[in-house]
């Protein structure tokens, strides 16, 4: 019987053929926690009586949400993870010394391997499917179970095939493609499904765009997002010191898909998701008619804080200034990305344009710090969620967009089209 990539990954892990809808218990290749979710997992771990991690090298803690600590409470919370990491001599512990947002840092470190089953106590763990792995977010107690046993159970998800065809026009990126998918199927259109992204348009999408695609699978309710390994993936992996040998899986022709969605990307304009759902997508042409003044622009996050995003923003910002009434905050996703941006002269461009460049952190995205919105303020953001109060006051508004739209809007002081600057 024909299988999808996701079914093949689970079959390989349990060592017999499995299909969508079946319940399986499987080993976990990588377990990921952060400074917010791991303390709960640690408490459950200790309450169980466990003394040792089942697979220490397959457990990573990435301190990224409130690091450096924003207040005493977050400092005490971070201390729980630090103490645990030091007690267990954790190999994959990433703090200020080597910091970054977990879903950018893990692939950068070679800790995501094609064919893996990965779980993380963070909903955007689905990002790692861009490297041909099954990767999904779970709760902190689920994480604790994997810490103790090295395993977890799943219902093998059915798959929705998303086929992108055509060549994307200028300033169309993975962010626009996934916002269009969510616009079409809604925030629950892929509930507990694997979103498999494919089609001839994939050859035009670099790894950064692919990470954006898979990152926001959860915003359509998806259990995971996944992309088969190709030459672009292999080129990315060649520069990484992978922790294990990759296993490449490909869907069989004739595999069973619950739904097939076909999108001609050549017809897409940049997409902006209006408040208060990622499914409220509008084309930039529609958005321009609203002539919306913007108070803040944020470029960063695990969705769009990678080097290509910073390069895109820098090309638009070079020689220009952020609008008088608008703030621009730029947050590189990892220290390595920040260093590369500095070496390329991007930091000079940002500062000269009037931007504030912060350390890597999830802070602004979740309304934690480093970019919180006040009452009634509007923000164009390259993040992944725009729910009520997501980035600050409940009356504030977040408009999700790609990095080019964000940079152009910072200059104009309102939602702007980067193609006409």
Curated annotation (Swiss-Prot):
Pfam families: Aconitase
Enzyme kind, highest EC tier: lyase
Quaternary structure note: Heterodimer of LeuC and LeuD.
Protein name: 3-isopropylmalate dehydratase large subunit
Binding site for [4Fe-4S] cluster: 302, 362, 365
PANTHER family: 3-ISOPROPYLMALATE DEHYDRATASE LARGE SUBUNIT 2, HOMOACONITASE, MITOCHONDRIAL-RELATED
Keyword flag Iron-sulfur: yes
Keywords carried by this UniProt record: 4Fe-4S, Amino-acid biosynthesis, Branched-chain amino acid biosynthesis, Iron, Iron-sulfur, Leucine biosynthesis, Lyase, Metal-binding
Entry's Gene Ontology molecular function annotations: 3-isopropylmalate dehydratase activity; 4 iron, 4 sulfur cluster binding; metal ion binding
UniProt entry tagged with the keyword Amino-acid biosynthesis: yes
UniProt xrefs under CDD domains: IPMI
Note accompanying the cofactor annotation: Binds 1 [4Fe-4S] cluster per subunit.
Family matches, as InterPro entries: Acnase/IPM_dHydase_lsu_aba_1/3, Acoase/IPM_deHydtase_lsu_aba, Aconitase_4Fe-4S_BS, Aconitase_4Fe-4S_dom, HAcnase/IPMdehydase_lsu_prok, Homoacnase/IPMdehydase_lsu, IPM_dehydratase_rel_enz, IPMI_cat
Lineage top rank: taxon: Bacteria
Organism of origin: Campylobacter fetus subsp. fetus (strain 82-40)
EC number: 4.2.1.33
Pathway in which the depicted protein is active: Amino-acid biosynthesis; L-leucine biosynthesis; L-leucine from 3-methyl-2-oxobutanoate: step 2/4
Cofactor(s) the protein requires to work: [4Fe-4S] cluster
Family: Belongs to the aconitase/IPM isomerase family. LeuC type 2 subfamily.
Role this protein plays: Catalyzes the isomerization between 2-isopropylmalate and 3-isopropylmalate, via the formation of 2-isopropylmaleate.
GO biological process: L-leucine biosynthetic process
Catalytic activity: (2R,3S)-3-isopropylmalate = (2S)-2-isopropylmalate
């Amino acid at each position: 019987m024909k299988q999808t990539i996701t079914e093949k990954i689970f079959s390989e892990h349990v060592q017999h053929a499995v299909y969508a809808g079946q319940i399986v218990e499987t080993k976990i290749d990588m377990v990921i926690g952060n400074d917010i979710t791991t303390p709960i997992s640690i408490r459950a771990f200790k309450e169980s009586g466990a003394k040792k991690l089942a697979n220490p090298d397959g457990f990573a803690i990435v301190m990224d949400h409130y690091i450096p600590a924003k207040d005493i409470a977050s400092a005490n919370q971070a201390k729980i993870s630090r103490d645990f990491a030091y007690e267990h001599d954790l190999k994959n512990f990433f703090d200020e010394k080597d910091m970054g947002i977990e879903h950018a840092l893990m692939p950068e470190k070679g800790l995501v391997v094609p064919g893996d089953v990965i779980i993380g106590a963070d909903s955007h763990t689905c990002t790692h499917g861009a490297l041909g792995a099954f990767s999904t977010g779970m709760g902190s107690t689920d994480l604790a179970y994997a810490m103790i046993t090295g395993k977890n159970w799943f219902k093998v998800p059915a798959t929705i095939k998303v086929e992108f065809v055509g060549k994307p026009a200028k300033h169309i990126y993975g962010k626009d493609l996934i916002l269009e998918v969510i616009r079409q199927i809604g925030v629950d259109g892929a509930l507990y499904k694997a979103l498999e992204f494919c089609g001839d348009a994939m050859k035009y999408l670099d790894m950064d765009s692919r990470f954006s695609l898979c990152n926001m699978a959860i915003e359509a309710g998806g259990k995971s997002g996944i992309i088969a390994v190709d030459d672009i993936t292999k080129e990315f992996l060649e520069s990484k010191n992978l922790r294990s040998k990759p296993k490449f899986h490909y869907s069989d022709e004739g595999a069973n898909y619950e739904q097939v969605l076909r999108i001609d990307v050549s017809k897409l304009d940049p997409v902006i998701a209006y408040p208060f759902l990622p499914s409220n997508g509008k084309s930039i042409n529609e958005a321009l008619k609203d002539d919306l003044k913007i108070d803040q622009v944020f470029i960063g996050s695990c969705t769009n804080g990678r080097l290509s995003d910073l390069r895109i923003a820098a090309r638009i910002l070079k020689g220009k200034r952020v609008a008088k009434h608008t703030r621009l905050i730029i947050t590189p996703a990892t220290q390595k990305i920040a260093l590369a941006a500095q070496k390329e002269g991007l930091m000079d461009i940002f500062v000269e344009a009037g931007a504030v460049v912060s350390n890597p952190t999830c802070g602004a995205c979740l309304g934690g710090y480093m970019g919180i919105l006040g009452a009634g303020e509007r923000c164009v953001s390259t993040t992944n969620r725009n729910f009520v109060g997501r980035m600050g006051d409940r009356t504030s508004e977040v408009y999700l967009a790609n990095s080019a739209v964000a940079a152009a809007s910072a200059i104009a002081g309102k939602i702007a089209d980067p193609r006409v600057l």
